Structures are given as C-alpha cells and as structure tokens.
C-alpha cells in the first residue's frame, strides 16, 4: 500500500475519484458495471471495497492492463458486453471510446443494410418494440380550451 492517498486516479484512460470504493469507482468507466468490476477485482486479488486512492502505482497499472484485456482474465462469456462479434466472430469486452465507436458503427451498419432496426433508427422511432401511439411524441402540443373560454368563443364566433 502506498503511503499517500490520491484523490484522482487515472485507470484505463479515465480519471476516477480516489475516495470511492474500487468497484464503484470502476463502474464510472463506460462499459464497466459493478458486477464486472467485482469480478475483475476478485481475479486480480484486490479488495473490492478498498478505496481506489489507496492503491499503489503497481496495482493501478495491473488494473489498467486487466481492464484493457478483460477477455483474457477468464471471466464467463456472459459477462462480456460484445459476445460473438459479427465482424470478428469472437467474444470481446469494450470500454470507453471503443464501446461508443462500435455502437455507432453497428447502428450505421443496420441503417446501411436497411434492417428493421436500421429503418427505425433512420426514422427516429423507437427500436425495441415499445408502443408509439401515445408515448414518444415529438413536435408542438395542441392545447385544449376550457369551459368559459370555449363558451365565449362560441358566442363571439
């Protein structure tokens, strides 16, 4: 354990608060949830509830390297966020900007091949089977006139 406490720790290219427990701080990284963070901490032999700022420089480096290549830690495939990648055919786990870019590319690919989901994305409609009759409306709302105002309008008009 290092002698000093760090309030900001850089892990896998992301600045994380050092005053949070390891699993909750790691959950601030896009693509890492609490369950994944707990599994990674367990595989590396780190206490999941130890404050992130108390980790030594070597432990932080080990953690960053593990997060960059989560697939190699031996986690079960259902824990990974990109199983059976359609282009590479392998199970992967993406984090940070890699995840955002891949999701954007997937949506563009769906639009390009004009799949049902791609067409829904193109039209700006809901994609996952939600109802659209009443919810998700866009544009201006049409107001409803009330009693007295309605009566005055009928007399005048």
Swiss-Prot record:
<dbReference type="InterPro" id="IPR019977">
    <property type="entry name" value="Ribosomal_uS13_archaeal"/>
</dbReference>
<dbReference type="GO" id="GO:0005829">
    <property type="term" value="C:cytosol"/>
</dbReference>
<keyword id="KW-0694">RNA-binding</keyword>
<keyword id="KW-0689">Ribosomal protein</keyword>
<dbReference type="InterPro" id="IPR010979">
    <property type="entry name" value="Ribosomal_uS13-like_H2TH"/>
</dbReference>
<dbReference type="GO" id="GO:0003735">
    <property type="term" value="F:structural constituent of ribosome"/>
</dbReference>
<comment type="function">
    <text>Located at the top of the head of the 30S subunit, it contacts several helices of the 16S rRNA. In the 70S ribosome it contacts the 23S rRNA (bridge B1a) and protein L5 of the 50S subunit (bridge B1b), connecting the 2 subunits; these bridges are implicated in subunit movement.</text>
</comment>
<comment type="similarity">
    <text>Belongs to the universal ribosomal protein uS13 family.</text>
</comment>
<dbReference type="InterPro" id="IPR018269">
    <property type="entry name" value="Ribosomal_uS13_CS"/>
</dbReference>
<keyword id="KW-0699">rRNA-binding</keyword>
<dbReference type="InterPro" id="IPR027437">
    <property type="entry name" value="Rbsml_uS13_C"/>
</dbReference>
<dbReference type="Pfam" id="PF00416">
    <property type="entry name" value="Ribosomal_S13"/>
</dbReference>
<dbReference type="GO" id="GO:0015935">
    <property type="term" value="C:small ribosomal subunit"/>
</dbReference>
<keyword id="KW-0687">Ribonucleoprotein</keyword>
<comment type="subunit">
    <text>Part of the 30S ribosomal subunit. Forms a loose heterodimer with protein S19. Forms two bridges to the 50S subunit in the 70S ribosome.</text>
</comment>
<dbReference type="GO" id="GO:0006412">
    <property type="term" value="P:translation"/>
</dbReference>
<protein>
    <recommendedName>
        <fullName>Small ribosomal subunit protein uS13</fullName>
    </recommendedName>
</protein>
<dbReference type="GO" id="GO:0019843">
    <property type="term" value="F:rRNA binding"/>
</dbReference>
<dbReference type="InterPro" id="IPR001892">
    <property type="entry name" value="Ribosomal_uS13"/>
</dbReference>
